[in-house]
């Protein structure tokens, strides 16, 4: 028994040594092939002068202007001339020309990639300009891809820029992806993220994926190395990391949650860096470079953390041997990404009687005393359920701030200690509103008119409508409608 164990150990050691030798030979072959490529590209030609003398002039693999432009990065040992030639031959696709796509495209174009494709169906808005650094005020209203390419051509005219002025669809994605070597996911919604990852896996393209919200960001290099479907040695895909999409109502956009420009810029720059590494580095060894998730938090120490990711899932819907997602299901539309990720809906939709437009609110509750001697309605209470940071930006006169997050974190209905006790109301509810003597109407307002409906339901569950004797409703359309109907100077953010 002991001899068998020794034999097994010896065989394992020999296998390990042989594999190490093989890896070294592969590396030597790669270096030799690179040297041969440089020699093939650095040819000579004979020029005959007027006096009949001949001179040999060397033709260099890069243009003279390119040596000057890229010289500072070419002297970096990890890049070199061969790395620059690989960049020039590379075809990179960026999906999304926003906060992530702009800095990623900026640095990839500056680095000298040969072809840069940009996919985005949106147009430039003023609210984009603080973070989407390729766009300018004069390009508001134009397609983002056109605005971005205009800037990039000024930066570096050598690459070929290809615009795709539309949002990515399952039917069109394979036809676009097939022409590129690597893909960058710079989008901001789960459905598109799954689509990009699936297409990249099915076509064997490495994928650099990033996201950013508020002051935090995440980065992953997926499907790297890009092995065929069913090959467990390939890098994991987006579905391997997130087999189930997040609940639709939990997805927060930059418009709702906010974003700090340098945060999303950092993640976009890191995407460009990872893309350059994939393009210029030798073939990756999965065991030597395990996949990881990089987490960036601008207000934490340290700023960066790394979490190791698992390998490909054995039951993954796209990269396992039993995959249900194929190029055919993409093209025929049977893979429904919107259905898979779900659609965010209101938790509770109010009836028309529970809603009031800003115009009607002003008619019911004017500041001035009616000149016709008409009856003055009861003084309303306005509850603004936006988060405090938004309330501090702008608020309606005499409104009180009770954030929707605070309302939802409390019990939805009052509880009694005993049969004769008063209901136990939440701490955030002002005493004057909870008073049994108060019958003044309550109007709830938010940014767009969605959270206010949920808040009205909660307030009624707490009994603030006095069984229907007191009006509790929301201002329909929120402060966006207030700007449109009442005050055109109301801050729009």
From Swiss-Prot:
Quickly give the catalysed reaction: [molybdopterin-synthase sulfur-carrier protein]-C-terminal Gly-Gly + ATP + H(+) = [molybdopterin-synthase sulfur-carrier protein]-C-terminal Gly-Gly-AMP + diphosphate; [molybdopterin-synthase sulfur-carrier protein]-C-terminal Gly-Gly-AMP + S-sulfanyl-L-cysteinyl-[cysteine desulfurase] + AH2 = [molybdopterin-synthase sulfur-carrier protein]-C-terminal-Gly-aminoethanethioate + L-cysteinyl-[cysteine desulfurase] + A + AMP + 2 H(+)
What is the required cofactor set for this protein? Zn(2+)
Q: Which GO terms describe its molecular function?
A: AMPylase activity; ATP binding; identical protein binding; metal ion binding; molybdopterin-synthase adenylyltransferase activity; molybdopterin-synthase sulfurtransferase activity; thiosulfate-cyanide sulfurtransferase activity; URM1 activating enzyme activity
* Pfam families hit by this protein: Rhodanese (PF00581), ThiF (PF00899)
The Rhodanese domain extends over 376-491
One GO biological-process annotation of the entry reads: invasive growth in response to glucose limitation
Q: Where in the cell is it found?
A: Cytoplasm, Cytosol
Pathway(s): tRNA modification; 5-methoxycarbonylmethyl-2-thiouridine-tRNA biosynthesis; Cofactor biosynthesis; molybdopterin biosynthesis
The record's section on InterPro entries has: MOCS3/Uba4 (IPR028885), Rhodanese-like_dom (IPR001763), Rhodanese-like_dom_sf (IPR036873), ThiF/MoeB/HesA (IPR045886), ThiF_NAD_FAD-bd (IPR000594), Ubiquitin-activating_enz (IPR035985)
What is the recorded function of this protein according to its Swiss-Prot or TrEMBL entry?
Plays a central role in 2-thiolation of mcm(5)S(2)U at tRNA wobble positions of cytosolic tRNA(Lys), tRNA(Glu) and tRNA(Gln). Also essential during biosynthesis of the molybdenum cofactor. Acts by mediating the C-terminal thiocarboxylation of sulfur carriers urm1 and mocs2a. Its N-terminus first activates urm1 and mocs2a as acyl-adenylates (-COAMP), then the persulfide sulfur on the catalytic cysteine is transferred to urm1 and mocs2a to form thiocarboxylation (-COSH) of their C-terminus.
The name this protein carries in UniProt is: Adenylyltransferase and sulfurtransferase uba4
This chain's source organism reads Aspergillus fumigatus (strain CBS 144.89 / FGSC A1163 / CEA10)
Taxonomy, top ranks, is:
Eukaryota, Fungi, Dikarya, Ascomycota, Pezizomycotina
Gene (UniProt): uba4
């Amino acid at each position: 028994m002991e001899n068998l164990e020794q034999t097994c150990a010896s065989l394992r050691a020999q296998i390990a040594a042989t594999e190490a030798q093989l890896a070294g030979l592969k590396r030597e072959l790669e270096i030799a092939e690179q040297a041969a490529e440089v020699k093939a590209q650095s040819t000579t030609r004979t020029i005959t002068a007027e006096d009949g003398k001949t001179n040999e002039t060397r033709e260099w693999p890069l243009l003279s202007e390119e040596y000057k432009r890229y010289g500072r990065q070419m002297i970096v040992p990890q890049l070199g001339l061969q790395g620059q030639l690989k960049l020039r031959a590379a075809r990179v696709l960026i999906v999304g020309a926003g906060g992530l796509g702009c800095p990623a495209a900026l640095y990839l174009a500056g680095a000298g990639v040969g072809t840069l494709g940009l996919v985005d169906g949106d147009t430039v808005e003023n609210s984009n300009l603080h973070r989407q650094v390729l766009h300018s005020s004069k390009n508001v209203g134009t397609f983002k891809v056109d605005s971005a390419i205009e800037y990039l051509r000024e930066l570096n005219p050598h690459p070929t820029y290809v615009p795709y002025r539309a949002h990515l669809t399952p039917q069109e994605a394979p036809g676009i992806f097939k022409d590129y070597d690597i893909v960058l996911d710079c989008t901001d919604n789960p459905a598109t993220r799954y689509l990009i990852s699936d297409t990249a896996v099915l076509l064997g393209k490495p994928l650099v994926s990033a996201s950013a919200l508020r002051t935090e960001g995440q980065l992953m290099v997926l499907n790297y190395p890009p092995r065929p479907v069913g090959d467990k040695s390939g890098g994991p895909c987006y579905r391997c990391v997130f087999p189930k999409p997040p609940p639709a109502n939990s997805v927060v956009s930059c418009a709702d949650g906010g974003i700090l420009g340098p945060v999303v810029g950092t993640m976009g720059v890191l995407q460009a860096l990872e893309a350059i590494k994939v393009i210029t580095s030798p073939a990756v060894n999965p065991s030597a470079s395990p996949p990881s998730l990089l987490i960036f938090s601008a207000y934490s120490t340290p700023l960066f953390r790394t979490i190791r990711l698992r390998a490909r899932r054995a039951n993954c819907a796209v990269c396992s041997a039993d995959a249900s997602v194929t190029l055919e299901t993409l093209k025929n539309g049977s893979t429904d990404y919107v259905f898979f990720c779900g659609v965010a809906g209101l938790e509770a939709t109010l009836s028309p009687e529970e809603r009031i437009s800003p115009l009607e609110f002003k008619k019911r509750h004017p500041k001035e005393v009616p000149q016709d001697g008409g009856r003055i309605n009861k003084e309303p209470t306005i509850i603004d359920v936006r988060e405090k940071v938004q309330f501090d930006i702008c608020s309606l006169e005499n409104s009180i701030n009770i954030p929707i997050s605070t309302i939802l974190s409390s019990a939805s209905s009052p509880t009694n200690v005993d049969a004769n006790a008063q209901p136990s109301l939440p701490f955030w509810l002002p005493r004057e509103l909870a008073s049994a003597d108060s019958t003044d109407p309550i109007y709830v307002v938010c940014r767009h008119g969605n959270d206010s409906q949920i808040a009205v339901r909660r307030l009624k569950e707490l009994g603030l409508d006095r069984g229907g004797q007191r009006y509790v409703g929301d201002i329909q359309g929120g402060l966006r409608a207030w700007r449109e109907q009442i005050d055109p100077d109301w801050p729009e953010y």
